[in-house]
Structures are given as structure tokens and as C-alpha cells.
């Protein structure tokens, strides 16, 4: 009995079966993969063996590609771009699905472009150039870490030992240049840098290498980073030995090229030349696969990490091919339409085929994840293999031994990374350590890694050539041009505590007419023009970003200085006049007293009497003119004339004195409007600052003061002048803002000023060095040691306490005191009239005395005989004149009248003779 099936249903079922049930494609019997690399190279010789072994193992594993055989086709690039490119095209003609290699980074750049154009995967096991990026070369993969990863390990090693500056020696090709560029980037992250670069060509002769290394010796750092391709000759170390650069002062760090080279050497005697060199070696974890591979190739002792990566690369491509075949994708090839247009040329590019599923194979390779003999094979971002640890190797005279391990997340340790992970440690930064290292010269003590200076190349130190406050630092203005000052002495004394010799020279900076700008000083240290700067340099954040400062050797802070009011008002009544004017006024009273007494003595009874009475009358008369009308009246016209002028002068003096004293007392009672930086900031008065210092930057940017308010000043003389002029006069200021050491020196030399408010913006003075200079740390330690002695106080006393160290100012005469020159005109008039009156009086007395002497000669009255000696006669004459002047004017006139009457009436001759002798009162 047959089944009745509807034909339409049968057809539908057949279609569903065809669409749903997968059909296995015909697996190819043979799949070609290509390899382009330098056969006759340190890496190439080992890699060739590893590649052949890998293909053999893949084909022997029947559970893997099943009946498909993997065939390896190899072309020798000879580290040549042209030969490498030609070899790549040769392989493409033979229908390869993927290509392995090359070793050379320069060849890798070219073949990566070919892979990009023809869409086939290119997998390198040794091209470590970090610029071979997935963005630029999307079909390029590598199963070895790039140099950026290796440089990260090397920089951690540099940072582990505290070195900040290095010299890089590298091959002048893509590998060397781009590797050192990655090193520079990693060093920058650690605040370190490459001080000098030595590019070397593979064709450089011994003379060139010698000159290049010899030139680098003049640079301070002694840490050398070597980055080349493997060099079996190791010429660089022979030359370094000849130049005595393999001593205890030097550090030689090599990337993994050295370990690859050493693994290929059969003569261990070569190690003697490399004593103390430290390098990196890719860490290959122990595994069963590794043991099996090592046992299989035990006859080949030149095997290295890159050869192991080559072995894993073959397996990785095999995994990708297996994934493609399992998905039923056929291995097919096509001619490139672009290359078909080249038909007929001698290059025969039309024969080149490309794999149709190249992009799919690339996707499968990127998803590969298996454990190879070199470790885990898995790609991360940037299409670089994930994870790679390094061994830190050290060369002694007889062997190469491992002193530790490095991992990206774990840092350094003497325990292998696999062991640490098994102990479930997640952070090893605090436990970082390495084993004992033999350094160049055979020592175990870590080299300092740099030389500050030597006699041939001393430390160049720039110092400011100050023209004000020269006690701190300046250049002597004589033939010696010696640099001296407080800061210089501190530096020299601190340098004695540095545990090594530092030859140095001082070079002054500035035009000698004004103090230099200290920011320019710092910038020159940053730019490498000078190695350090010594002087009164304030440590401020903007400068600390450019240079490294030592420990402050002097504490500073900004302070506000204003004119001071004297708190002691005991002698305030003397301030309106200068001391010179007071002396002149006092002398004037005495002179007027004497002149009036002389003019009034003969005719005024009030000015006669005993000498004591006359002296008191004379002084009281003169000084009482200040306060009230005199009891004694002047009689003579000459005395009245003198008194008129004197009283006028006295009136002007009194009025001026009263006005000035009132002003002083008023100001004395008014409190200063400026009490500190806050009140100064709130006001609009002009402010002085020292030109060239950071004060201007702080006042404008930090406190927001208008630049128009700020007046640059450059010396203590300008400070004093500006403060005395005050804010109302052009060029004057209400206050000065400056650092405390300058102000202390200013107050020690200039009095009449004071500090108001508390110091602010507390900073210090330090010595500036180039960034990451080790001398900055050693000088800081030296300054701390110096401060524990009395030497720092002695230096301060020597330079800053020449006048006084009290820091408090004494009173200075008022700026608006009245001087003698203010009354010079009045005094000249008074002196002229007084002298004239006195001369008139004297002439009158002489005339009367002459007449009196004639009367004596014509009279018959006997008189004393004259002395024979002229001197005695002159003295007698003077005494007679004084006695004559002392007589009353009335008696003299009466005598003269009687003499005149006797001449007219002879009868009176006897009477006159009787009265010829002048009466004495």
C-alpha cells in the first residue's frame, strides 16, 4: 500500500532541507602560507627552524586541519625593502592565504602597505616598531609586543633606581628612531627625559662610533640606553671599553636585542666585555609545550623569544584557517583588477592573485585565543598581542643571570609573574625589588648615573647682576669682577656639604644699569643655557613648573612699608624747624640782645647798672620779644630800626612754627589708612614694588590690582624718595610691597618708615636647577646641614647687619620741616639793617672819641704820659675808647657843649678845665 504524498509538499520539504541543513564544502588538500624575513640574521636563523617545526607539528596533528595540509613558502628579504617587497609578490603569485614576517620594521612598513592594498593578513613575530599601527595598516598583526611595551618596562627600571636623565644610543632606522620616540614618551610620564641622542648607522665604522660616544661623555648623564637590532659583533661595548666608559660611573641598559644576541653566542668569553650591562629579555613561562619544544630542538641552542613567537604565529594562522574551513568557506583566489591593468609590463603583476577571504581570515585571527609555547596568544587594542612580561638580566664576566621580573601591572619582583599570580597578589608596587646587580666595574653599589660637572666642563651658574640691594648678590665693579654677596656665600658654604666635587663658574646676568628680571633668569636655566641659578630667587609656583628648587635657605614673605609716625612725642615741639634753623634762631636772639644793648647802653638807663643786671636785662629783653611787649623801651632810632626788622622776622618765624606744629600734631593724631595688604588692596593709592621681582606678577594676577597703580622702584634711594613724596605727588607712593629681606635691609639703612600688617605670601629663596637635576636634592640636604651650624647666622651677620639688625626704624626729620633756606631772605635783610645800624653807631662813637681826644690835647689839664711802646700805646687807646663808649651820651654831649662855650667865652676856661675829666658813673 503506497503512501500518497502531495508533490508540492515534497518539493517544499526538499527546499527546506537544502536551505537549513549545512553542507560541508570541499576541504582543500593544501593551503599555502608565506613567510618573508631575513634568513641570515640572528632572529632569522632561529625563526626559520621554529617556523618549519611549527608547520610540521600542525600537519602531524590530524585532529586539527584534518586532511588539509599546511605548506610554508619562504622568501629571503635580507633586511632589504626591495627584496622584501619582491619576495612578497613572489609569494602572492603562489596563492598564499596569509604572510608571516618580516623581521625588519622598515620592510614591515612596505609589505604592510601591500597587504592593505591586496587584503591579506600580514603577521609579524619580530617587527616591534610602535608606529606600525592598526589604523594605518589594518591588515598588520604581530604576535610580539611592540617597543612601546618594552620601553615602559625600561622606564620603570630607570625610575626604580631614581635616574632622571639618560642618553639614548640607537640604530638610525625605523626600529631605532621610533623605539626611542616611544622611550621619550614613557620617560616624560615619569618626569624624566633623554638628554642626548646618539643615532648610529649599521654601516658606521669604528671611528664614527668612537667620536659619537666620546662626544656624549661631555653630557652630564651616565645612563646609556641601547636600542638596536641584534648585533653579534657587539662593537659598541668594545669602543666603550676603550673610552673607559665601562667603569663604576656608567650605567648601560639594553632592550631585548641584547638578550637575543647573547642567546645566539656560542663563545661565552665575549661576556667579559659586557660586565655590568643590564638588559631585558621576554619572559617565557614554563609549560609542557615549552618543554616539549625545547626537547625537540635541543640541538639548536640559538633559539630566542622571537623564534618562539614565530612558532606560535604558524599555529595562530592555522587556527584561523580551521575556523574558515569549519564555516564552509572555500579557499579561493582572484586576480586584482588594479593589477590586471599592468598586463604586458615586464613586472607581470597581472599574475598576482589575492585571497578572496582575506578580510574574513583577519577577523578570525583577531579572535584567536590559545596558549602557545611563548605564552597566551590573544590580541587586544591596537591589534597587539596581550600581555608580555620581561626578565631583568645582568651580565657578569662569566654568565648572564636573571635578577628579577617585570610585569605591566605588578612592577618588579624577584618572583616570576606566574608564581605571583598563583599567590593571588593583585598589587606589587609596594613590594618592588630586584636581586643584586653587578654594575660596570664589578661593583654592587648603584651608580649615581650622572656627573654634574668636571674641570673641563664646569657647572655654568647664572647669577643676577644687581644694582640695588647689592648685599645679596652682585658683581664687583672693578678689575676682578668678583661675584659676591649673602646668597653667594650661602651657596659656597652649602656646596661644602655635598658629598662630591662640583666644579662651577659664575656668569652674571644683567646690563649693570638696572636689576635683571628674575623670570628671564629662570627661563635660561629651563632652556639649558645655564645649569643652575644662584641668587635671591623666590620660590613661586610659576617658577617651580620650570625648574627644580633646593630647600629654601632664607625665609621670605611680602610685607607692606609706609612712612612711620613717631610714637614718642616728647620732643615733638622741635620738629617744625630743622636743628640748623633752631641754632640760627637761638644765635639770632643773642645777637639781637647784644646789638640792642650796645645801641641803648649810652642813652637808656634800663640798660645800665651793674654787669649782672645788664646781662639779665639784655637777655630778657631779647627773648621776651617772643611773648609780650618789653618793659624796657628803646630810645635810639637805630635800635628801633633793628627792632622793627627783628620783630617782623620773629612774627614770620612764629607763624610758620605754629602752622607747621599744628600740621604735625594733626597728622600725629590721624591713624594711617593703610593697615596691611587688605586695606591697600581696597584703596586706589599708588603702590611701589621692586622692579624685576615676582611681586608685580603676584599683585596683578593673584590680587587683581590694576597695573597702572604699581610703580617700579629699583633702589633704597628710590624707595625713600617715593614714600616721602606720598601718593599725591607724581612718582610718589603710599606704600611699598616687597619681600621681607629687602625691607629689613631698607629699614636698617633708612629711618622714618615702618612695616604694617602681617607678612603674607610666605615663600623662601632657593637655588634653581634644571628639572630633575640630582644636585637639587643634594643641595637641599646640604642647606639643612648648614642651617644646623652657626655658619648661616655668621653669613647673615656679615652681609645684612652692617648697620643694625634691629629691624626698627628711628625717627627721621619730618619731610616738610622748615629749613634755614626758607627764611634766608628775611635773615639777609635783618642782618643788613642790624650791621648797618651797628656800623653807624660805631662811626658816631669814633667821631666823638676823636673829638674827645682833641679836647684833651687843647686843654691845659694834665694827663697821663704815653707809653714808649707802640703796643702799649694801642692798648691804652683801646681801653680809653671802651671807657668812652661806656659813658652816658648825655655826659659826653654836656662836655662837648662846655667846650664849645669856652671857645666862645674865655672866662669860662677855668670852669671847662675843671670839667675836662669825664665824670664816671
UniProtKB/Swiss-Prot annotation:
User: What GO annotations for molecular function exist for this entry?
Assistant: calcium channel activity; glutamate receptor activity; ligand-gated monoatomic ion channel activity
Assembly behavior = May form heteromers.
Q: How does it sit in the membrane?
A: Multi-pass membrane protein
Positions bearing carbohydrate = 214, 300, 330, 369, 396, 478, 568
What does the UniProt keyword field contain? Glycoprotein, Ion channel, Ion transport, Ligand-gated ion channel, Membrane, Receptor, Signal, Transmembrane, Transmembrane helix, Transport
Q: Which gene encodes it?
A: GLR3.7
Which organism encodes this protein?
Arabidopsis thaliana
A GO CC annotation recorded here is:
plasmodesma
Give ranges for the Extracellular compartment.
26-580, 662-822
The portions of this protein that span the membrane are: 581-601, 609-629, 641-661, 823-843
Where does the secretion signal sit in this chain?
Answer: 1-25
Q: In which tissues is it expressed?
A: Expressed predominantly in leaves and siliques. Also detected in roots.
Q: What is the lineage of its organism?
A: Eukaryota, Viridiplantae, Streptophyta, Embryophyta, Tracheophyta
Per the record's keyword annotation, is Metal-binding included, yes or no? Answer: no
Q: What is this protein called?
A: Glutamate receptor 3.7
Q: To which protein family does this belong?
A: Belongs to the glutamate-gated ion channel (TC 1.A.10.1) family.
